[in-house]
Regions:
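C-terminal partner/receptor-binding element of secreted or periplasmic proteins
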Residues: 174-210
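Bacterial N-terminal signal peptides
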Residues: 12-21
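Cleavable N-terminal signal peptides
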Residues: 17, 26-28
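Functionally constrained cores in energy, signaling, and assembly domains
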Residues: 9, 28, 189
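Extended, low-hydrophobicity segments enriched in charged/polar residues
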Residues: 29-181
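N-terminal secretory signal peptides that target proteins for export/translocation
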Residues: 1-7
């Protein structure tokens, strides 16, 4: 099964059951010298309605993996274009989530860009990539060194967190992670309050990444 990430146990079981058959076949590894410089990135952000992760210190800020300082010279990724919904590749994943009672999509968007330098954390805001998504903000970045990494530092605020999280209304939940990614392989970014399923594929600006 083409799926990467470090999901919590309860959500991992759900993802294995629901998404396993939907994951695209593994493709070329991102570190291949012949890899294209334009990438298509598609994300489905969904809310965990169950609160099964339990209470935590919601004020704690995680630190994404990566070097203490970026590789030199520093290159900032270039935004190429947004991808229209008609060309989304994760519609089946979003539909599966929508049909559950515990995991509800709150955003689904895709775009093309070139990669930033590994360790630079140079990316684009949710507002630029997805427009206005109630309660969701932050930065998403694609970095390339020896390998390709997708990272994000997201904040999600809701007036009615699941009771199991023991979080008061208006709590801001921070998700900060960076994963090594491979083409056409689903990646999962995990938080007790919400999660992100991501797909990175070689992009072609002339064909909308297909």
């Amino acid at each position: 099964m083409s799926f990467t990430g470090r999901p919590r146990i309860t959500l991992a079981l759900f993802m294995l059951a629901v998404l396993g058959a939907l994951a695209p076949g593994a493709g070329t590894r991102a570190q291949n010298a012949a890899s294209p410089t334009v990438y298509t990135i598609e994300l489905v952000v969904f809310r965990n309605m169950s609160g099964s992760g339990g209470p935590e210190d919601w004020g704690a800020k995680a630190v994404a993996r990566g070097p203490e300082s970026p590789e030199q010279p520093v290159v900032t990724g270039r935004f190429v274009q947004s991808i229209p919904a008609a060309q989304f590749q994760l519609n089946d994943v979003a539909a599966k989530l929508q049909n559950t009672s515990n995991y509800q999509p709150i955003a689904h968007f895709a775009w093309q860009q070139t990669a930033s330098t590994w360790g630079s954390r140079a990316g684009f805001t949710v507002a630029k990539l997805a427009g206005s998504v109630p309660g969701l903000s932050g930065i998403i970045y694609l970095e390339r060194g020896s390998y390709l990494h997708l990272g994000m530092s997201l904040n999600y605020q809701t007036s009615n967190p699941p009771s199991g999280l023991a979080a008061p209304p208006g709590t801001v939940f921070n998700l900060t992670e960076s994963h090594r990614v491979r083409f056409r392989t689903l990646s999962y970014f995990d938080h007790p309050a919400y999660g992100v399923i991501a797909l990175v594929t070689p992009g072609n600006a002339a064909t909308g990444g297909r």
